Amino acid sequence: MLVTRAREAAESNTFYAQGGIVARPPGDSAELLASDIRRAGDGLCDPEAVDLLAREGPDLVNQLLVEELQVPFDREGDGFHWTLEGAHSVARVLHVKDETGAPIERALLDACRREKNVRWLTATTAVDLLTLSHDSVDPTDRYDPPTVVGARLLERETGDVKAVLARETILATGGLGQVYLHTTNPQGARGDGIAMARRAGARLLNLEYIQFHPTALVHPKGRLLLTEALRGEGAVITDAAGNRFLRDAHPDAELAPRDVVARAIHQRMLERDESYAFLDISHKPAEWIRERFPGLTRRCLEYGFDLTAGPIPVVPAAHYSCGGVSVDRDGATTLARLRAAGEVSASGVHGANRLASTSLLEGLLWGWRAGAAAARSVRSETLRRPIAVRPWEPEFEPVDPALIAQDWLVVRHTMWNYVGLLRSEKRLDRAGRILGELRDEIENFYRRGTMSDELLGLRNGIQTALAIHRAASDNRVSQGSHYRENGTEAASSPRRKRATLL
């Protein structure tokens, strides 16, 4: 059974991924890829997870995406067109123009639709995971090891809440960018999976490491991600006066790791009291830009900007969570029968900062391994007896949408200003007070209100925001995408290789 809160199954972060997916071109090696991942991760990567991804990930891309699903990656001559992205030693990124995620996801969904035994539940929001200790009507189940036995689901169209039992449950709920004021993520990236897993008792890992994409187009409609590949192909970043400043922050300038570029842009904006910086690729031939980046060219024109004509305004935006629900090599969490894959999980691959275009690769490999492990488990094990869960007891107080909207504004502004690119003890202390009070208010609101997707999202959002805040507050070491003003430098700290657990 595939469950998604979206009305269209394709609505996800994967669908909007632009740059590409890491594979293995001629002359590259697993060792070199692993080295690049570890360098970007700033010493916090799990070496075994990195080696697994570097060794098996590119082979799976070739086997599943290229040969079996025939994703139409761009070609050049007799081979593929490989692109270079920031912090990569070689050009090793496969892409489909500048809209790589969409054709990959379409191919995977089409393959799922061909399987007759897959049931689809769209417009269905998970309320909570079901556990033996909390949801079983048998009081002796509380003495069993923590075990997930399914989920409670809300049918958005009818408002009905029902329990669905499962021998294996896999979280693939994506990211949490919507808890920030500026984000490249779609509306559904509210941290739902993080919050549900935490309420069920799963261990969380490294949630302070939030990667901010350096370049999101500034527009009242929202923030449009401007792919890393633009800078890989020669785009430059300037301030309002037209000055390139990234060389002062890192020798690789525009091709430096994302956290370095994002902080440098943010700092420049603060120093100059400017609302945005500028990205410029207009020195390239216009036809080449339109051919290489057709999707971005089209989307930018819809927003009133022309990539081929001159610089366009950009800001850093919350983009990817390097942490999440702690998982092993097969996606198993610390709760029995619960697995996780993709951005909701923390496999240890990304460490303190993710290398560009490795997210699709990690999601592909860990999704493959988690699915295979779950299938083996289902074939070899059964629940020891039928499980009966407690019935849902609904409340019926109408939900005021103005309260939900205002609470989201408080969450997003607080996270952006105090738990964002630049963090300090004073900022984090203030954020803790604001978010803590708001959590209590939202929890009371949730317990009284009529169940809805919007109310669930708000509850999950505040709980995820507080989990990020706690991890950031506990970790005084500036490392990768977690930057503490006046914090300890990672290189001089004994915590350099220590993960932050919740």
Model segments located where?
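Glycine- and aromatic-enriched mobile tails/lids
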Residues: 7-10, 16-21, 63, 71-91, ...
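Short beta-strand to alpha-helix junction loop
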Residues: 45-56, 92-110, 121, 183-191, ...
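FAD-site-proximal beta/loop scaffold in flavoenzymes
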Residues: 128-158, 163, 305-349
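Glycine-rich loop(s) and the adjacent beta-strand/alpha-helix scaffold that form part
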Residues: 168-224, 357-369, 373
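An anion/pyrophosphate-binding glycine-rich loop and adjacent beta-alpha core
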Residues: 196, 202-312, 373-379
